[in-house]
Amino acid sequence: MSTVKVNAIRSTSGTSDAITLNSSSGVTAINGASLKAHNLIINGAFTVAQRGTSATAEEYATVDRFELSHGGEDEDCTQAQHALTSSDTGPWAKGFRYSYHITNGNQTSGGDAGDFCFIRYRAEAQDIASSGWDYTSASSYVTLSFWVKASVAQNYYGYIRTDDGTSQGYPFQTGSLSANTWTK
């Protein structure tokens, strides 16, 4: 077996490298375009829960880097690190073993306009800055991809917000979810 050691590959008629490499991360660019498809979410697989695995407390109480906020409801929401099993088709097949589980408490008076329960993740500015996404430009994009399962079939809402510089908000919808079915 032969080994060729290089840090770049360039066509004999080329004026710039077609592929660049480094010793720690392999291929770093193709035709000058950086490979930026890495996950920006720290603990996005919910494997670390230093504070505990279940709580009704708000803020950072279970899964690291993820915060629960709620208010107005009859009974507090519960947050938990939930162990997935092979019956959790979808995320299990992709190697995920945990989820961040939110249980809405018994709302005997029904949902009111001011009731809310949401998850917050605060991405680090350095990760957003190195992602290649220019959140101030309408022609720059980032992909938000996640698995979701709900016990109630309906459309759910969320948003991405940045507080770097001028605050920017980007709302999104899950689309109509089927009850108790994992969707990506």
Question: For each predicted feature, which ranges?
Answer:
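Extracellular and organelle-lumenal recognition/adhesion modules and their flexible linkers in secreted
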Residues: 3-184
